[in-house]
Amino acid sequence: LNALKVLVVCPAIAKSVWVDQLKKWGHAYSTYKVLRGLTPASTFWASNEVGTPAFTISNYDILAGRRASRKQKGGGFATSEYSGWADALVAWKPDLLILDEAHAVKNKSAARTAAVAKIAAASKARLALTGTPVWNKLLDIHGLMDVLFPGAFGTKFQFAQAYMEPIHNGYGWEYIGVNKLRLEELQRRLTFYMLSRKKVDVLKELPAKTRVIVPVEDIQWDTSRHGEEDDD
């Protein structure tokens, strides 16, 4: 692949994990940057770094631009515009785009999905990592695949017509169920794009379980305990 410029997009909480693993395994990459904030620098990679192996890590929520309003002391509201990182990363043209927890872009109408789609179109190669490609309904997989391979499964409506069952909700028709007669066809088409493995199939090939101790603040521990009590 010869990917000199690699971009990882992940949940914010996973950015430090990627940094730790990059330091441990990514010896081929001489430098890395972790993106923060909603307003990027005009050039976040210096000119003397162009052409060297570079790794960039971002979270989904800072890619899309947004408008934020805050109340002023004297009354009224002040509005700020934030551009987001998407355009800067499109201009950077990654050799490889990695989407961690890729089901985050299953919703085509979300701003983050549109931002990731722009970056994906500018990337030479794309890799999506997720254990739950279908979160709630089958259309989730169409949203994800359309970011990675635009048009490969037709429009959202065409996909629903082909692989889902219409259900009348009392007001109109919506596509929720699965067309079992064409499920095997869909699975066959997806194998061209996806690599899926069950734990039972690869358990013997996996290393021994590793336990990692993660330090937390008192408030995090208290919140976790209260959450468990609520579940009970």
Predicted feature residues:
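Conserved helix-turn-beta segment of the N-terminal RecA-like "Helicase ATP-binding" lobe
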Residues: 14-39, 148-150
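Conserved helix/coil segment N-terminal to the catalytic DExD/H
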Residues: 39-55, 61-93
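Walker A/P-loop NTP-binding motif
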Residues: 1-3, 115-117, 147-148
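Conserved Walker A/P-loop ATP-binding site and its immediately adjacent core
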Residues: 3-24, 135-140
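A short helix-turn-beta junction within AAA+ P-loop NTPase domains corresponding to the substrate/partner-engaging
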Residues: 141-154
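Inter-lobe coupling linker of SF2 helicases/translocases
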Residues: 57-63, 81-91, 110-124, 153-232
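Walker B catalytic acidic pair
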Residues: 100-101
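Conserved helicase ATPase motor motifs in RecA-like P-loop NTPase domains
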Residues: 124-137
